[in-house]
Amino acid sequence: MAREPGRVRRRERKNITSGVAHVNASFNNTMITITDAQGNAISWSSAGMMGFKGSRKSTPYAAQVAADDAGRKAAEHGVRTLEVEVKGPGSGRESALRALQAVGFTITSIRDVTPIPHNGVRPSKRRRV
């Protein structure tokens, strides 16, 4: 069934000067979401969205490209200063942060919000390579 040709909703420019960059760096991918102070998403990107597939998604370069993309989208909405919240053990943590600085944002604070279990579930078996 074909979609009806309706009005395409244009993205309105939000005039937000400061935001929060949530960098989620897992072992398999790196996701960057830039939100306002209340947590409403302004822009987002990930290594997979940028065309990296498989093991290339977990590289620092993929995280850098994704952070650059999310940063440029947020800059269009007027964001100039960022607080950065980094979560996860992935390799894209530092490179994503450097890419956000390269876009031209003023980074006011960097917080590590990686969840640490108080001895939660049993970890998966040890890898043997």
Swiss-Prot record:
Keywords: Ribonucleoprotein, Ribosomal protein, RNA-binding, rRNA-binding. GO terms for biological process: translation. GO terms for cellular component: ribonucleoprotein complex; ribosome. One of its GO terms (molecular function) is rRNA binding. Coiled coil: none annotated. InterPro entries: Ribosomal_uS11, Ribosomal_uS11_bac-type, Ribosomal_uS11_CS, Ribosomal_uS11_sf. It holds the Pfam family Ribosomal_S11. HAMAP family: Ribosomal_uS11. Part of the 30S ribosomal subunit. Interacts with proteins S7 and S18. Binds to IF-3. Belongs to the universal ribosomal protein uS11 family. Located on the platform of the 30S subunit, it bridges several disparate RNA helices of the 16S rRNA. Forms part of the Shine-Dalgarno cleft in the 70S ribosome. This is Small ribosomal subunit protein uS11. It comes from Erythrobacter litoralis (strain HTCC2594). The gene is rpsK.
